[in-house]
């Protein structure tokens, strides 16, 4: 016996679980399917919410009503952003993609995992509502550029 508790001549070989922990990005053993699977069919579905990350999901809201201008002596009200401009509506000068004329607000839901429910053996999640600014511009021919800022 050695001091580690393993007899002479016997060595510890790494088990499958140890190897998988060291190389989590190993290649799939099966080739990809040639036919569409359910996940690829739903990938660009127009009725499903857009999912930019694993924790953020869009919640489409109706456009906000126009903001009234403040009267003399009143504090200015924060302007609600709601814009979808076309490049032909803008002057011919250079325009920054983060120009306020191109901005609108979107509601997002941040989903974070909570603890696991012991009784039902299922994972619980917490959803918190947030806002993000989206700068959007479109041009003739159907092109569009969106920049999302959290």
Swiss-Prot record:
Disulfide bonds: none annotated. This is Early 4 ORF6/7 control protein. Belongs to the adenoviridae E4-orf6/7 family. Modulates viral and host transcriptional activity to promote viral genome replication. Stimulates viral E2a promoter activity by binding and inducing dimerization of host E2F. During viral infection E1A protein binds to cellular retinablastoma (RB) family members and dissociates these repressors from a complex with E2F proteins. Free E2F is then bound to E4orf6/7 which leads to transactivation of viral E2 promoter, and cellular promoters such as E2F-1 promoter. Activation of cellular E2F targets promote cell cycle S phase and thereby possibly favorises viral DNA replication process. Interacts with host E2F proteins. One of its GO terms (biological process) is viral transcription. Keywords: Early protein, Host nucleus, Transcription, Transcription regulation, Viral transcription. A motif (Nuclear localization signal) lies at residues 1-58. The keyword Transcription regulation applies. Residues 1-31 are annotated as: Disordered.
